[in-house]
Amino acid sequence: KEIMKIYIDFDDVLCETAEYFTKIAKEMFGIDVPYRQVQFFNLQKSFDLNDEQYEALMKAGHLPENLLNYEETPGASEAINKWVDQGHEVFIITGRPFNSYEPSRQWLDEHHLERVPLFCVDKYGRETAKQDYRYNMTLAELYNMTFDFAVEDSPAAFEHVIHFDNCRTAVFDRPWNSRAELPNDRFVRCKDWQEIDRLFENREITK
């Protein structure tokens, strides 16, 4: 049986990050942007924040106690555990700051994903110091890996996934990607984890 290598993004794929940020934006700044109206992957733009506010929001959202409170996206851990049970190799690839590795790892362990490795990749060129964590990766290192199937929500990350030859990508349908043009027909919009799992199961038929 063919073993597939699977790339899974973290925020707004495994957990409801934007939902959480809408809550803290309201608490911190009285900004009321419902989740459905988060139009841009860039939250500074979506919430119309100045640089200082945006920095404060990001800091708050990445505090360990807050990271641990993110809600799991329904069906995520079931589908992923099924794939792991079938012998596939799953990697969680996040663009979160390198220093949020520990709480992110803890969140995965608490949501029955302790068997799945997590890597923090500097997807958006935000990291300044090359800290020496085992689970850090540059984009160049990511591009040296191969994947057969990916799950992503961020239009900004589509260009990363295009690097993987013949990789089918499930695009998790979110308000901020609803108008995004999908790069090619290997990208398929899915509304939930059930659809993602179905796409994965039928990948041979649709290649």
Which ranges hold each PLM region?
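Short, basic/glycine-rich phosphate-binding loops at helix/coil junctions
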Residues: 46-63, 117
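Short catalytic/ligand-binding loop motif for oxyanion handling, primarily in non-cytosolic enzymes
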Residues: 15-18, 23, 90, 99-103, ...
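Generic beta-sheet signal
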Residues: 93, 121, 172-174
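Structural recognition of alpha->loop->beta junctions
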Residues: 110-122, 146, 182-205
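Active-site neighborhood of HAD-like aspartate-dependent phosphohydrolases
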Residues: 2-54
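Acidic, Mg2+-coordinating phosphoryl-transfer loop and its flanking beta/alpha structural elements
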Residues: 149-191
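Substrate-recognition "cap/lid" segment bordering the active-site pocket of phosphatases
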Residues: 98-151, 155-162
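Short, acidic loop-to-helix structural element flanking the phosphoryl-transfer center
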Residues: 61-92, 97-105
